[in-house]
């Protein structure tokens, strides 16, 4: 970090080696087998990546969480109350195919294994998409993931209830197999110590929803936000490669919403994936996701093979 660079940006910038050095003496608590189970269908997640990127991040988060708990204790002492358990909320945003889910799962595993043994829940905002029938009725099936495709009132109420100390809060669950919210498939979240909220839209604010104005937003309740970033050419490549793997795997299931794609030749599949990327996911990235990047507390930038090459931490 040059002095001039540090002064001109709201972020502290670290290359991979600088960030890895901040691990200090935090022990590795995951085995190679566990790491293999955490990674996404299209990602290379190594022991080295966890040690050099995610362990320093978990150390930083542990400091923030401990500080937050001390602040809560001070408030309780001042008020003379025994406070409710209020979860620390971490949000993870970024493009489709960038690896948000893997980042979320790795952090969940690491944070739950700190000596404090905190309980960590993971929720994706996919569950808060409107059901397919609603999207069809509104002509929004090709806008899945865009702001107007979400039940934002329900998502905001979910995080608001958690931050208000409500003992049991329910979240809808999304199935990528049927490409829809699971009817009556709600998951109950019971006052975890930490909630990781992962999704395309978790950094968006009211200005991103002019069609559906309300005064509070998800980002108002988030304690620490992460944006997983990568160059657009890599994102497109990862999206297409993931589509090809799904074509040979999940799409072959007769119950899959995309079962017809399993019958495509490789060239047809590549062309289909490229079209889906350009017409839907790239458009959403440019219009609604990328503009929220600089709202994040921390930005992780990936290079080839999903390896993080740079970390920017808000001062």
Swiss-Prot record:
One Pfam family of this chain: PRK
Keyword Kinase in annotation: yes
EC code(s) of this entry: 2.7.1.33
GO (cellular component) term, any one: cytoplasm
Record's keyword annotation contains ATP-binding: yes
Pathway membership, UniProt: Cofactor biosynthesis; coenzyme A biosynthesis; CoA from (R)-pantothenate: step 1/5
One GO MF term: ATP binding
Principal place of residence: cytoplasm
Reaction(s) the record says it catalyses: (R)-pantothenate + ATP = (R)-4'-phosphopantothenate + ADP + H(+)
One GO term (biological process): coenzyme A biosynthetic process
CDD domains in UniProt: PanK (cd02025)
Locations listed in the record: Cytoplasm
Residues engaged in binding ATP: 94-101
Keyword tags: ATP-binding, Coenzyme A biosynthesis, Cytoplasm, Kinase, Nucleotide-binding, Transferase
Domain of life the protein comes from: Bacteria
Family statement drawn from the similarity comment of this UniProt entry: Belongs to the prokaryotic pantothenate kinase family.
Name used for this protein in its record: Pantothenate kinase
Taxonomic source organism: Citrobacter koseri (strain ATCC BAA-895 / CDC 4225-83 / SGSC4696)
Gene that this sequence comes from: coaA
């Amino acid at each position: 970090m040059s002095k001039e660079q540090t002064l001109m940006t709201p972020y502290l910038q670290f290359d991979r080696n600088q960030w890895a050095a901040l691990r200090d003496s935090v022990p590795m608590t995951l085995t190679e087998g566990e790491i293999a189970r955490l990674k996404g269908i299209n990602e290379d997640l190594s022991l080295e990546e966890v040690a050099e990127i995610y362990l320093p991040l978990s150390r930083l988060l542990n400091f923030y969480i401990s500080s937050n708990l001390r602040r809560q204790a001070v408030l309780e002492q001042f008020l003379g109350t025994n406070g409710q358990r209020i979860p620390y909320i971490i949000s993870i945003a970024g493009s489709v195919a960038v690896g948000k889910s893997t980042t979320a799962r790795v952090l969940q595993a690491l944070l739950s294994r700190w000596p404090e043994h905190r309980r960590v829940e993971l929720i994706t905002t996919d569950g808060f998409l409107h059901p397919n029938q609603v999207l069809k009725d509104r002509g929004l099936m090709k806008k899945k993931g865009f702001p107007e495709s979400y039940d934002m009132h329900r998502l905001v109420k979910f995080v608001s209830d958690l931050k208000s100390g409500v003992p049991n809060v329910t979240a809808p669950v999304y199935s990528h197999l049927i490409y829809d919210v699971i009817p009556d498939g709600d998951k109950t979240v019971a006052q975890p110590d930490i909630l990781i909220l992962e999704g395309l839209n978790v950094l968006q604010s009211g200005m991103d929803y002019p069609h559906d104005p309300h005064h509070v937003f998800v980002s108002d309740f988030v304690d620490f936000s992460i944006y997983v970033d990568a160059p657009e050419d890599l994102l497109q490549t990862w999206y297409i490669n993931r589509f090809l793997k799904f074509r040979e795997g999940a799409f072959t299931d007769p119950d899959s919403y995309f079962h017809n794609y399993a019958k495509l030749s490789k060239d047809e599949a590549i062309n289909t994936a490229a079209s889906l990327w350009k017409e839907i996911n790239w458009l959403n990235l440019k219009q609604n996701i990328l503009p929220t990047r600089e709202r994040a507390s921390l930005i992780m930038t990936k290079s080839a093979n999903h390896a993080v090459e740079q970390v920017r931490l808000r001062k």
